[in-house]
Design a protein with these regions (language model features):
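Surface-exposed loop/turn motifs at beta-strand-loop junctions within extracellular Ig-like
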Residues: 50-52, 140-146, 268
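Short beta-strand/loop motifs in extracellular/secreted proteins, especially
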Residues: 1, 42, 108-110, 335
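Solvent-exposed loop and beta-edge segments used for protein-protein assembly and interaction
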Residues: 27, 38-40, 93-95, 130-134, ...
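Feature activates predominantly on carbohydrate-active enzymes
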Residues: 248-363
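Acidic, contiguous N-terminal accessory segments
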Residues: 159-270, 274-296
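Beta-rich interaction/scaffold domains
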Residues: 72-167
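Solvent-exposed serine/threonine-rich low-complexity stretches and specific carbohydrate-binding patches
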Residues: 14-23
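Aromatic, loop-rich ligand-recognition surfaces of beta-strand-rich domains
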Residues: 1-14, 27-73
């Protein structure tokens, strides 16, 4: 049969000629027809039927629906499309720099919901490959075009190939908390703790955290480091304010441990500061030498912290400072102090002139 229409000028045109598919002893009783091009029509009709009949015409049309947008393929549902994506586990080759979106049936759309490691797969689909192979969990949002309904997929595992391959028998990743995200070493050499005498930094913004690091390092090791602004040099911890790549972020950093120096780089002072905490923890693991190797480190979770209830029992300010300093050591970034359960409005705070009248604030 033909699908014909009357356009806005009153002219009759053929939109599509269609031949139905045999099914059993007859033909499919539900068909979806997609036009090659969009049309604007005042009227639409089916005509020029070619019927198969023994003694009578046997064509009947129960219902015809016309849509201005693509409809889902028969048999495809929002749930089935989501399940199909969840069933896929993929490997992203080392030469791929943009995430390939899943293919979905006509009538559905899909967009990236996010990855657990945004420092490897960014919100825009940009990929920065890790040092060695790493599993990244990715989620999508699938939308049914006809209804506008959407559904998130579960996390789908993607193996993102690394830029390097770790060989057996080389230096192991330092043990720190939280675990270093990426590590690579092609060496068995070490750098002696005693050989590191200086700290350099490239930007005045780093001075405060460098001074804190010098103080902390002396507390940990007994070694008094000399800090100075300038470029990287041998026998030194060298801190640089620059972006190692597009996705590492303010809290991420790279560390290159060489035979005669340790270089740390981050786009922000925070990342450099976290690199310093890693060095302090590395000393706790081995107080004589550091393993030569490279790391690319970053947090998995944006907020990492806890609530400290200091309302039930008084806690000294020094104690709270010690708690927050320990948090920094473990790269935690969110501290909330619960000070009081008193339900007192601000304007009633000073209602009583004397200390023994404090409870008047509740009145």
């Amino acid at each position: 049969f033909d699908i014909k229409y009357i356009d806005k000028n009153g002219e009759e045109k053929t939109a599509k000629s269609f031949t139905n598919t045999k099914q059993g002893e007859g033909y499919k009783n539900e068909v979806v027809i997609r036009l090659d091009q969009p049309i604007e029509a005042k009227e639409l009709k089916l005509c020029n039927f070619v019927a198969e009949a023994a003694e009578w015409n046997n064509i009947g049309i129960l219902e015809m629906e016309v849509y201005s947008n693509d409809q889902a393929e028969q048999g495809a549902t929002l749930d089935s499309v989501v399940e199909a994506i969840e069933a896929e586990s993929k490997t992203i080759a080392a030469d791929v720099d943009t995430l390939e979106m899943p293919v979905v049936p006509a009538g559905f759309s899909v967009k990236l919901n996010g990855a657990d490691f945004e420092q490897i797969i960014g919100d825009n689909g940009k990929i920065v490959h890790p040092l060695t192979d790493k599993t990244v969990k990715v989620s999508y949002v699938v939308t049914e075009t006809a209804t506008g309904k959407g559904k998130e997929t579960k996390d789908v595992d993607y193996i993102v190939k690394g830029t390097k391959t770790q060989a057996d028998g080389k230096n192991a990743k330092p043990t720190v908390i939280p675990e270093i995200q990426e590590w690579y070493s092609d060496s068995t050499e070490k750098i002696a703790v005693s050989s590191l005498k200086t700290v350099t930094y490239t930007d005045d913004k780093l001075k405060d955290v460098v001074d804190e690091f010098v103080s902390d390092y002396e507390d940990f090791t007994g070694i008094k480091l000399t800090a100075k602004k300038g470029g990287a040099e041998a026998n030194a911890f060298n801190f640089e304010l620059k972006a190692p790549d597009e996705l590492l972020g303010e809290e991420g950093y790279t560390m290159d441990i060489q035979k005669d120096r340790i270089n740390v780089a981050s786009v922000d002072t925070t990342g450099n500061m976290y690199g310093m905490q890693t060095i302090l923890q590395m000393y706790k693991e081995n107080n004589e030498r550091y393993n030569v190797g490279q790391m690319r480190d970053y947090p998995r979770f944006e907020t990492r912290g806890f609530l400290f209830d200091v309302a039930r029992k008084p806690v000294s300010l020094e104690m709270m400072k010690e708690v927050t300093r320990t948090m920094r050591y473990y790269k935690m970034n969110d501290f909330q102090a619960h000070l009081s359960d008193n339900y007192i409005f601000l304007e009633d705070y000073g209602k009583g002139a004397q200390e023994n009248e404090a409870f008047k604030a509740y009145e």
